[in-house]
């Protein structure tokens, strides 16, 4: 990819604006793939989460979510089950199902997150669990 030319199909994570997702603590996300590249049915996000931080209880009505661990360790909780995850592990959060994700490692966790259909950090597509 030519560094001086913008492309609709190729994305460099360092060039994507960061944001702090709702119902998460100590988390910085970068939306790598979404409608800005023409994706209509999938969204891919790179998340970096600090130790002891992560996703508070919430669900995504009508949206499935997959988390793939790149670095660090975290505990995922969904459907009454919990599992500690490390690099190369992944978890699935079904649509409408409350879930929690908490980093256990000293170093930040880097997580590739996939949503289908796209979530686009839309509050109308999230259900907080209090």
Description of each model-found segment:
Residues 37-40, 49-53, 73, 82, ...:
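Short, charged/polar surface micro-motifs in flexible loops or helix N-caps
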Residues 29-31, 45-60:
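Conserved short histidine dyad/triad with adjacent acidic residue
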Residues 80-95:
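Short acidic-glycine-tyrosine-enriched beta hairpin
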Residues 56-58, 76-77, 93, 99-106:
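Short beta-strand His + acidic residue motifs that chelate non-heme Fe in jelly-roll/DSBH
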């Amino acid at each position: 990819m030519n560094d001086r030319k913008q492309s609709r199909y190729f994305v460099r994570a360092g060039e994507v604006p960061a944001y702090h997702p709702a119902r998460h603590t100590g988390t910085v996300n970068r939306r790598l793939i979404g409608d800005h590249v023409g994706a209509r049915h999938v969204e891919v996000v790179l998340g970096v989460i600090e130790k002891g931080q992560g996703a508070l209880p919430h669900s995504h009505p009508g949206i499935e979510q997959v988390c793939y661990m790149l670095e660090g360790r975290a505990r995922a909780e969904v459907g009454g089950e919990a599992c500690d995850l490390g690099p190369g592990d992944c978890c699935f959060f079904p649509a409408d199902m409350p879930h929690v994700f908490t980093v256990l490692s000293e170093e930040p966790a880097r997580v590739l997150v996939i949503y289908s259909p796209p979530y686009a950090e839309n509050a109308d597509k999230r259900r907080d669990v209090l």
